[in-house]
Swiss-Prot record:
Pfam families: Ribosomal_L33 (PF00471). HAMAP family: Ribosomal_bL33 (MF_00294). GO terms for cellular component: cytoplasm; ribonucleoprotein complex; ribosome. GO terms for biological process: translation. PROSITE patterns: RIBOSOMAL_L33 (PS00582). NCBIfam families: PRK00504.1 (NF001764), PRK00595.1 (NF001860), rpmG_bact (TIGR01023). This is Large ribosomal subunit protein bL33. Belongs to the bacterial ribosomal protein bL33 family. The keyword Ribosomal protein applies. InterPro entries: Ribosomal_bL33, Ribosomal_bL33_CS, Ribosomal_bL33_sf, Ribosomal_zn-bd. Keywords: Ribonucleoprotein, Ribosomal protein. GO terms for molecular function: structural constituent of ribosome.
Length: 49
């Protein structure tokens, strides 16, 4: 079952991206390095509630 998750920047805490994940394959929280337009650089983004 795929669910929508929100990714937030770890530096400025802004919620920048929405993506989907398969809970069966990825039971843990997702971490991705993505571009944050407020920080102006690529930063680590983590899944939020």
């Amino acid at each position: 079952m795929r669910v929508n998750v929100t990714l937030a920047c770890t530096e400025c805490k802004r919620r920048n991206y929405i993506t989907t994940k398969n809970k069966k394959n990825d039971p843990n929280r997702i971490e991705m390095k993505k571009y944050c337009r407020w920080c102006g650089s690529h930063t680590m983004h983590k899944e939020t509630k």
